[in-house]
């Protein structure tokens, strides 16, 4: 199952609706994958990997490196630093893996294709995420 929500700009309205209508989906899900802001931005390659389970965070890091993302730019951080919708889900008891990038142009008119998109980075992230999902599915 996939669920897309609005971000902090709109107060996580989509997530709030999901919580209100389907709370068991939050806590009974095998895992929640939070694809946070700025994935694949060209200004900086910093990519934060955070999870409530450090084994899953390390697994994602390894997958990212295997798919060509530069290891020196991947920061594995504690689960308690998960932000955005992932933060909200974690505090409701969900198991969360979160990826978030960095971007000097965040919320600026200059934050667009092609100048501020790292296409190879996006491709590496997409392949790693697909592999992680396949591993979770068994």
Summary of predicted features, one role per range:
Residues 6-103:
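Metal-dependent peptidase/peptidase-like ectodomains
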């Amino acid at each position: 199952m996939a669920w897309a929500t609005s971000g902090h700009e709109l107060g996580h309205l989509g997530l709030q609706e999901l919580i209100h209508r389907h709370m068991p989906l939050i806590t009974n899900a095998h895992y929640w994958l939070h694809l946070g802001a700025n994935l694949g931005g060209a200004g900086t390659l910093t990519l934060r990997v955070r999870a409530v389970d450090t084994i899953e965070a390390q697994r994602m890091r390894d997958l990212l490196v295997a798919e060509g993302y530069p290891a020196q730019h991947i920061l594995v951080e504690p689960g308690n630093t998960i932000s955005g919708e992932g933060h909200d889900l974690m505090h409701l008891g969900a198991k969360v893996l979160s990826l978030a990038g960095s971007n000097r142009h965040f919320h600026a008119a200059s934050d667009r294709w092609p100048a501020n998109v790292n296409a190879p980075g996006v491709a590496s992230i997409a392949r790693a995420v697909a592999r992680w999902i396949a591993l979770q599915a068994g």
